[in-house]
């Protein structure tokens, strides 16, 4: 295990979050150890001062400890082992020490709500990336080698095999989301999965594709299973709340037999009567809003320019339902490459800091250690190790990202909208083969590469001109 995530460091973190008895869950995303906590008043915000910890994001029920790419998974695994061995400690003394500090650190209700999306979607991200990469590589090979869609032979069969994973993922994605969402909101995962499946079924007996539900109306009322992910999230939340209320009044002897049964009946009724139409309206409204922002160059610039701030506050996972809505409405995720420009702006800013700093300075060492992950789309090392501590370069990095977003928005406005072939995927240079458009994969790759180049150059120029004044370059 790397020095930065030694057992001593993890034991210190465990103590400062209130001890094992305060830990509700332990997980990770690509760069962060995510610890769910029972009582946030027991958490010491000075965890971020520990050597090896890049930053800490606090919400009402979760502590996100930023380690960087490749380390978060090892940290989560080691922390889980510690939690399995450690006795529960009395954290009253820690609470008394931290209570006054944390009064100024309360997170907003919006941030708490968006933090739920990390719990729901983070476990799905590796699958999104894998399926998207396979689809992108297969599409690129088919385009370059001019393989017709109806071709026969070993190569077409291999390409179809590579594409089948994304088809399977997006066909049954709502069931995975329903399961995770019900758990995130405090319910039973399988109940959420069953309710989500209602959105997947077909209600037209004449349809030749899909899975017919066996009825076409709900006691005479029409069924319109629109809304997809938006509707499923609402239904999973309702399912978890209803389950909690039912369980409160259910005798223990009947809990196993009747709680889920009653929960499903009530939630399904609400889904058919209220949630499906409501989810459909929200889905259409959200799609309309972001499609118009995407087609507006200045809207694209604003989105790209603000995304790094969302990452800092740990709420960037809240965009994932929007990605899924855009996949349904457009066939590709046009928002993701725009937001990816934020990371490219950071790369440009970091290169400017490297150029302006002394040959043997600590800053150059920091940039060298963080620039490769930044080029590959992992921005936290640059954020927390290079730009954010110096503030001005962070602002100029945001401006560089905004310039890249403006470029992509202008190209879309001129008639070439493009996007990611998956709801979620890697950013940076790794995402190049995942780009697609109505005009094909190669034009989309060219637009994305152009946006990255613009963000690099503008981030470099803005930081050189405005981001290095009165900034510690040692």
UniProtKB/Swiss-Prot annotation:
What membrane topology term does the record carry?
Answer: Multi-pass membrane protein
Location of the active site: 29 (phosphocysteine intermediate)
One GO CC term, this protein: plasma membrane
The reply to whether Protein transport figures as a keyword in the UniProt entry is no
Q: Function, please? A: The phosphoenolpyruvate-dependent sugar phosphotransferase system (sugar PTS), a major carbohydrate active transport system, catalyzes the phosphorylation of incoming sugar substrates concomitantly with their translocation across the cell membrane. This system is involved in N-acetylmuramic acid (MurNAc) transport, yielding cytoplasmic MurNAc-6-P. Is also able to take up anhydro-N-acetylmuramic acid (anhMurNAc), but cannot phosphorylate the carbon 6, probably because of the 1,6-anhydro ring.
Domain topic, free-text comment: The EIIB domain is phosphorylated by phospho-EIIA on a cysteinyl or histidyl residue, depending on the transported sugar. Then, it transfers the phosphoryl group to the sugar substrate concomitantly with the sugar uptake processed by the EIIC domain. The EIIC domain forms the PTS system translocation channel and contains the specific substrate-binding site.
What's the protein name?
Answer: PTS system N-acetylmuramic acid-specific EIIBC component
